[in-house]
Regions:
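Membrane-interface capping segments at transmembrane-helix boundaries
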Residues: 72, 177-187
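C-terminal ends of transmembrane helices
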Residues: 63-75, 124-131
Length: 187
């Protein structure tokens, strides 16, 4: 595997994961960077993402998502709707960013769906708990944190994918440590 292929996979992994938190942030980041810089190169048919029409639509959808996701109950309805949109965004992002290295689009789409879908399931499952334990007061805070994390992950995935992989490895190690420790306490 070449360095370019590895970096493309790392970028695809990071962007698809970010899409599990907010579908439109990584899509808009990729579209804008592809349109305005040389940091992102999109091959056909994904280069359509960098058109001003698509960028405008993504910006409007992001605005709606950001506003709706801050309101208790509306955020739960939004999460149901996003159950299809976030994995689809993950599929598009994974396929678009690995298209340069020739990864089969179906395999890329499956990877993106799994990554974004997995993150979305965790997010959607945790949000009702936040609503119930904080009487809805915590929703805007948690939603804002999710949006910031999605944006930072998107930028890191493009600019420094090695760093993002290191952060994922650390997060995975911490999760495994927490899970093992929790299981030991239960015994």
């Amino acid at each position: 595997m070449t360095v370019q292929a590895f970096l493309s996979l790392a970028t695809a992994f990071g962007l698809s994961t970010a899409a599990g938190l907010n579908a439109y942030i990584p899509l808009l980041v990729v579209a804008l960077l592809a349109r305005l810089t040389s940091l992102v190169t999109l091959n056909e048919p994904y280069d359509a993402m960098s058109s001003w029409w698509v960028i405008g639509v993504l910006a409007v959808l992001l605005l709606v998502e950001v506003l709706v996701d801050k309101v208790p109950l509306a955020d739960t309805i939004n999460d149901v709707i996003q159950t299809i949109i976030r994995p689809a965004a993950g599929a598009i992002l994974f396929a678009a960013t690995t298209n340069v290295i020739g990864l089969h689009p179906v395999l890329a789409a499956i990877c993106g769906v799994i990554l974004a879908g997995g993150i979305h399931v965790v997010k959607a499952g945790g949000r009702p708990v936040v609503s119930a334990t904080t009487a809805g007061v915590g929703n805007p805070i948690v939603s804002t944190i999710e949006d910031v994390v999605s944006f930072v992950m998107s930028v890191l995935a493009i600019v420094v994918p090695y760093l993002l992989l290191a952060l994922f490895a650390i997060a995975l190690a911490l999760f495994i440590w927490w899970y093992v420790r929790r299981r030991q306490r239960m015994v």
